[in-house]
């Protein structure tokens, strides 16, 4: 398994492309690779222990699982001391079951975050010989950069690709790279615009014979089918392919180091970077990118620490060994009707699992900077995307039991499924926590005491319930605290995020806004789960990339029902008891104010005002990399051009 691919000659004799209508070629000669459909019912794990696995990987996973189980066992023992006195009701049994699952969930995240914090502070975790501080290595193979697109603004899309192209050219190793725009666009006017902008790009940078464009007539299997079609037609020319998203930007330095990492490690099938979220303008986008910049490394370094050579694939900003992908990542069509049947939606997890089954190592390198993406501008846009991810992740229930998968690959899928089931579980936990005192000891009509869940739980077993609440909140918020401490210990990052005080204020504001949005997210994720289980498909629409521009009628349609429901529940709770209303206030308030919160956080001027105040700052704003500056320049220039779509 040396990953060797027979190379065809580089297409150097293609004529300039000034107009697609003139019939000039936009693609290189084909070099097909067979990409057979993989079976989920047959297969075996080819290599159990990878050469590139870090030392002590078994102990790392023992720490994660053992720490999770130990913390959960202690929490359950304390919870039993609260519930057991006076008998054990059905509601209390439901509460305990929900508590066990949810506490184990956050305890595992906490244990992983602690490992990530230590790795970040110790500046450890570098692997595969990829050293961002070393001289730039020389390359010996060819790599294709693939940018799939679906009904995107072509000027904006190709501005990002041009910035990447120029950055790669600055490394002096452009001859080792070809660039492909892989269009699945279904709207004819956008397709025609893509062709025009592609021709302009080739003329602008002299990219004839190195930048290519292909539009599928049938966009079967969505993005996964788009990439698979390229592999089957052109993959034989390229030992590696680097997958980009429509909003991806990467530096040439990072791309060259990724390719060198693949060349130096012939048993590695995939290397995933940690894309930093950038270019946020709205308040929501800026709080998201700040959180990703401060907390994201703690989480990413943590999972990379215990993933080892069984890391996951996020679908973009990753380099893949083409032959390994062709041999093992051909996705089957799942039996049954949508939403569980049909083409695999969240294809990246499954492709990674199948490649690992085939004996290839999968790695994440979160320390390698120079990889960027953009986030949704509004909560509404995030939830639209999240609904699609929800369906894709729940669909993995049909894949997780496939023959021969590594147990860590199965764990990736189970975590993805569990992420969406936790939303309705948190809601049920809250309702059961109120229902227990409401059904029993919390009401004492003889003494005329008002109903008070807080008084009931505080009086249970010497206040152990309060300790459970405090510990749960600490475990939930610990990644934020650890991220802030790591920031303080890095003077350069600290200054780039506005300094210690502004960073602390940013974390506080982000936590408050996230808490206000949490009931909305919980409700809509829960609804998404039930819609998927009821058979409702999510569809496939182009993503919003710039500011959200949400109208008040659209906000009222999206969140008006939730606000009315919050008012109804708040009024009902107050009629039962003001104490009950106070207990439910964090959830009720989030529902009631959902419209103004989403509206304010969707505003560009609010986000930019906070930027001027030094709130939600990230290093890429204080000292932006050249590739991001260039991409922004090109996109601003494109915005001045007459619209093509």
From Swiss-Prot:
The chain crosses the membrane at residues 62-84, 99-121, 417-439, 466-488, 501-523, 554-576, 581-603. InterPro entries: Glucans_biosynth_gluTrFase_H (IPR023725), Glyco_trans_2-like (IPR001173), Glycosyltr_2/OpgH_subfam (IPR050321), Nucleotide-diphossugar_trans (IPR029044). The keyword Cell inner membrane applies. HAMAP family: MdoH_OpgH. It is found in: Cell inner membrane. This is Glucans biosynthesis glucosyltransferase H. The keyword Transmembrane applies. Belongs to the glycosyltransferase 2 family. OpgH subfamily. GO terms for biological process: glucan biosynthetic process. CDD domains: Glucan_BSP_MdoH (cd04191). PANTHER family: CELLULOSE SYNTHASE CATALYTIC SUBUNIT A [UDP-FORMING], GLUCANS BIOSYNTHESIS GLUCOSYLTRANSFERASE H. GO terms for molecular function: hexosyltransferase activity. GO terms for cellular component: plasma membrane. Keywords: Cell inner membrane, Cell membrane, Glycosyltransferase, Membrane, Transferase, Transmembrane, Transmembrane helix. Involved in the biosynthesis of osmoregulated periplasmic glucans (OPGs). It holds the Pfam family Glyco_trans_2_3. Pathway: Glycan metabolism; osmoregulated periplasmic glucan (OPG) biosynthesis. Its EC number is 2.4.1.-. It is an enzyme of class 2 (transferase). Residues 1-28 are annotated as: Disordered. It is a multi-pass membrane protein.
